[in-house]
């Protein structure tokens, strides 16, 4: 994406319909609601992806799993939503914190740039968030995701193990205890109060951060690239395809009657632009970071000591399938990420612009 064009001075880096700036509460709540909706709706994609990626942790005699086989193992439809609670907690809290951190970084940097040069135009036609350069989008997304990703790492591991069928946790307590102890025999003892009345010794809180490096190696580049491509699609490419209603009306004499199918009012146009940009950006970045996701899942499901990204990578490449193992579950992740991004970013962008949110929190 090119640098923001120069134009007449713009007094506000971020403005709403009331001329005020959304505070942190608005971004936090809008992000949390967006994350909550997408997490509950798309949990089946995450569950099936996790089970496809865990396959080589089972015995070597087992037949290679497929999506069809995993679906047949499910006895009830609601089993597809196993792990929804930790997933919802992770996504809603994570999305709220991420959107808040990202918006604060972007607006603060935008205000700093305008304090140096008031002629810079940072206004976006479809969003109240400032329009930055490609490198600034990449950097802010990378840093914001790194901070929030590490904070929410314990919930991420609980979510991953709930989705797996290697750990049959029946409650959040069992999940937290099992990860803390990280020993299957001790996990079984916890489930039987007559054997063990509580969490015994030998546990470690470090277990809640297993796979942190792989997770951040996946999420930070993903987030940085995502913000970069999302802003590029939103501000530069898609507006060329979806015309502005005022532009269409002014040139209506030269347009055929069929062109009216592609004319949208400002609110609908911004929603379509934001959702389309989110889906395209998510699909691009998901494919690029797929190997890190496969490694992260394997690390968080194994109990082996001294596991590292390099060790797991070599092991996965030696297994049947070779390099294809690094892209196991990609189609499910593409589907989930694409739809999730379309839902969450559209909801987020529209909520922070809505009159209701403005009247309540501004």
From Swiss-Prot:
Q: Does the keyword Membrane apply?
A: yes
**Compartmental location:** Mitochondrion inner membrane
Give the InterPro entries listed for this entry. Answer: Hem25/SLC25A38 (IPR030847), Mit_carrier (IPR002067), Mitochondrial_sb/sol_carrier (IPR018108), Mt_carrier_dom_sf (IPR023395)
What are the protein's UniProt keywords?
Membrane, Mitochondrion, Mitochondrion inner membrane, Repeat, Transmembrane, Transmembrane helix, Transport
Cellular component annotations (GO), alphabetically ordered = mitochondrial inner membrane; mitochondrion
- State any GO BP term from the record: glycine import into mitochondrion
Reactions catalysed, semicolon-separated, are:
glycine(in) = glycine(out)
Which residues span the membrane?
A: 28-53, 83-109, 138-163, 211-234, 273-299, 329-347
Q: Pfam families under this entry?
A: Mito_carr (PF00153)
Q: Does the keyword field hold Zinc-finger?
A: no
Picking any one GO molecular function of the record gives: glycine transmembrane transporter activity
- Residue ranges that the Swiss-Prot or TrEMBL entry lists as coiled coil: none
User: Topology relative to the membrane, per the entry?
Assistant: Multi-pass membrane protein
Give the Solcar repeat ranges.
22-108, 132-236, 269-354
What does this protein do, in the record's words? Mitochondrial glycine transporter that imports glycine into the mitochondrial matrix. Plays an important role in providing glycine for the first enzymatic step in heme biosynthesis, the condensation of glycine with succinyl-CoA to produce 5-aminolevulinate (ALA) in the mitochondrial matrix.
Q: Which family does it belong to?
A: Belongs to the mitochondrial carrier (TC 2.A.29) family. SLC25A38 subfamily.
- What is this protein called in UniProt? Mitochondrial glycine transporter
- Organism of provenance: Candida albicans (strain SC5314 / ATCC MYA-2876) (Yeast)
């Amino acid at each position: 994406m090119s640098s923001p064009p120069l134009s007449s001075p713009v007094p506000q880096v971020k403005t709403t319909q009331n001329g005020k700036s959304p505070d942190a509460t608005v971004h936090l709540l809008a992000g949390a609601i967006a994350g909550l909706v997408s997490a509950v709706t798309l949990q089946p994609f995450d569950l099936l992806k996790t089970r496809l990626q865990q396959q080589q942790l089972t015995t070597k005699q087992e037949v290679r799993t497929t999506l069809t086989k995993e679906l047949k193992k499910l006895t009830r439809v609601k089993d597809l939503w196993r792990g929804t609670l930790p997933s919802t907690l992770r996504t809603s809290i994570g999305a709220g914190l991420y959107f808040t951190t990202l918006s604060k970084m972007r607006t603060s940097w935008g205000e700093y740039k305008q304090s140096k040069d008031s002629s810079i135009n940072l206004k976006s036609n479809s969003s109240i968030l400032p329009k930055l350069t490609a490198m600034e989008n990449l950097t802010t997304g990378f840093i914001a995701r790194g901070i929030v990703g590490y904070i929410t790492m314990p919930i991420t591991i609980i979510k991953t193990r709930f989705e797996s069928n290697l750990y049959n946790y029946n409650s959040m307590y069992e999940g937290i205890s099992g990860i803390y102890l990280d020993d299957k025999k001790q996990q079984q003892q916890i489930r039987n109060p007559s054997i063990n009345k509580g969490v015994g010794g030998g546990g470690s809180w470090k277990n809640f951060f297993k796979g942190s490096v792989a997770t951040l190696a996946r999420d930070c580049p993903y987030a940085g690239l995502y913000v970069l491509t999302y802003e590029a699609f939103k501000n530069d490419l898609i507006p060329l395809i979806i015309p502005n209603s005022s532009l269409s009306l002014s040139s209506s004499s030269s347009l055929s009657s069929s062109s009216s199918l592609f004319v949208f009012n400002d609110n609908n146009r911004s929603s379509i632009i934001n959702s389309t940009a989110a889906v395209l950006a998510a699909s691009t970045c998901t494919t690029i970071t797929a190997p890190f996701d496969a490694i992260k899942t394997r690390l968080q499901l194994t109990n082996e000591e001294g596991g590292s990204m390099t060790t797991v990578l070599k092991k996965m490449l030696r297994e049947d399938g070779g390099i294809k193992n690094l892209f196991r579950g990609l189609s499910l992740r593409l589907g989930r990420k694409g739809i999730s991004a379309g839902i969450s970013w559209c909801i987020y962008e529209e909520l922070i612009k809505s009159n209701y949110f403005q009247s309540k929190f501004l």
